């Protein structure tokens, strides 16, 4: 096309320019190299995004949404709210889960970001920016994350952070020993080889893992044994109105008993009512997370509502 245009200027030619920008104040050659690698990665991602959107036949509206999501990732505009995870023993905050929010108007929800990032083959960027942004907050809030509180970070199934970012991530996580917990889902369907790779990687980083959404889909004890996480998060589906379902109570009790026998900490996820709270405490769960105890917030709180904490303590007393 370019040769044709040189010979005949009337020939129409479409030229694409792909670029990547990363700003910073490098103090060492390593810092400079990281900035360059990030800019190159963004350039390559922009090229992939344009090509991908043409190949899969997106509508004009979808193409526009895809460009917006890529701009969000290029400028790292992913923010996070933190939802407390509380101890079923005393109502104290044990940890926080970091939940994605997007800094853009009009607002785009996280599932939309994930969808278009996947179409543009940029899920590794979401994964890396998530870890880095959350770790930034943790390091800045040393008054909260003083070695006694943990942060749960969701990992996107099947995504591998590029090698040029991985060493930086390892270094930063190792500065927070015993603080980071990485959430995995059964739906990731990891192969034994990939699971072994992740186990070695997380062991090297010094982080624990949590198996998320346990009790959904094809959940079974075999998967729990394959992953052997430090935490298992019992899905909301099993906990909704559990006080009215002997079947759910029996199943959840079995999960808790099996987990405790294998040194796995249990977490009831999505607790929304007082009745659900009382039931999971009666069944012996270790940790509780949900709107009833505390909602996600941009501001990291250091304690839950005193009335809710008192309720937890009173229910706990009944089981001892």
Q: Which role does the model predict for each range below?
A:
Residues 1:
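Short helix/loop segment flanking the catalytic signature motif in cyclic-nucleotide metabolism enzymes
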Residues 4-40, 149-154:
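A short glycine-enriched loop-to-beta-strand structural element that forms part of the catalytic core
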Residues 15, 146-151, 175-180, 205-208, ...:
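Short, well-ordered coil/turn segments that N-cap beta-strands
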Residues 22-24, 123-197, 270:
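Catalytic core of bacterial c-di-GMP phosphodiesterases, primarily the EAL and HD-GYP domains
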Residues 24-28, 57, 88-92, 102-106, ...:
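EAL-family c-di-GMP phosphodiesterase catalytic domain
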Residues 53-118, 294-298, 319-320:
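Active-site core of bacterial EAL-family cyclic-dinucleotide phosphodiesterase domains
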Residues 64, 165-169, 196-197, 246-253:
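Charged helix-capping and loop-helix junction motifs
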Residues 139, 173-174, 196-206, 253-260, ...:
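Surface-exposed amphipathic alpha-helices with a cationic face
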């Amino acid at each position: 096309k370019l040769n044709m245009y040189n010979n005949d200027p009337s020939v129409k030619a479409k030229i694409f320019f792909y670029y990547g920008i990363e700003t910073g104040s490098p103090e060492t050659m390593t810092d400079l190299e990281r900035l360059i690698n990030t800019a190159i990665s963004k350039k390559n991602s922009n090229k992939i995004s344009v090509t991908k959107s043409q190949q899969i036949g997106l509508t004009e509206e979808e193409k526009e949404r895809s460009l917006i999501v890529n701009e969000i990732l290029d400028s790292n505009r992913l923010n996070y709210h933190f939802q407390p995870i509380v101890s079923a023993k005393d109502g104290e905050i044990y940890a926080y889960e970091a939940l994605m929010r997007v800094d853009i108007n009009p607002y785009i929800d996280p599932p939309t970001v994930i969808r278009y990032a996947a179409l543009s083959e940029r899920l590794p960027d979401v994964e890396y920016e998530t870890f880095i942004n959350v770790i930034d907050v943790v390091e800045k809030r040393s008054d909260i994350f003083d070695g006694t509180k943990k942060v749960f970070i969701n990992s996107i199934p099947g995504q591998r952070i590029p090698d040029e970012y991985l060493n930086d991530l390892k270094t930063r996580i190792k500065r927070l020993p015993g603080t980071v917990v990485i959430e995995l889902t059964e739906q990731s369907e990891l192969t034994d080889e990939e699971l072994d790779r992740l186990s070695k990687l997380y062991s090297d980083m010094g982080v624990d893992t949590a198996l998320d959404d346990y009790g959904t889909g094809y959940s079974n004890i075999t998967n729990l044994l394959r992953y052997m996480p430090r935490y298992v998060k019992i899905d909301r589906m099993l906990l909704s109105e559990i006080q009215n379902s002997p079947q759910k109570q029996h199943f959840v009790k079995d999960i808790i008993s099996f987990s405790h026998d294998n040194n796995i900490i249990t977490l009831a996820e999505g607790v929304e009512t007082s009745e659900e709270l009382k039931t999971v405490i009666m069944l012996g769960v270790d940790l509780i997370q949900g709107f009833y105890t505390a909602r996600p917030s941009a501001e990291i709180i250091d304690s839950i509502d005193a009335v809710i904490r008192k309720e937890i303590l009173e229910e706990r007393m009944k089981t001892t």
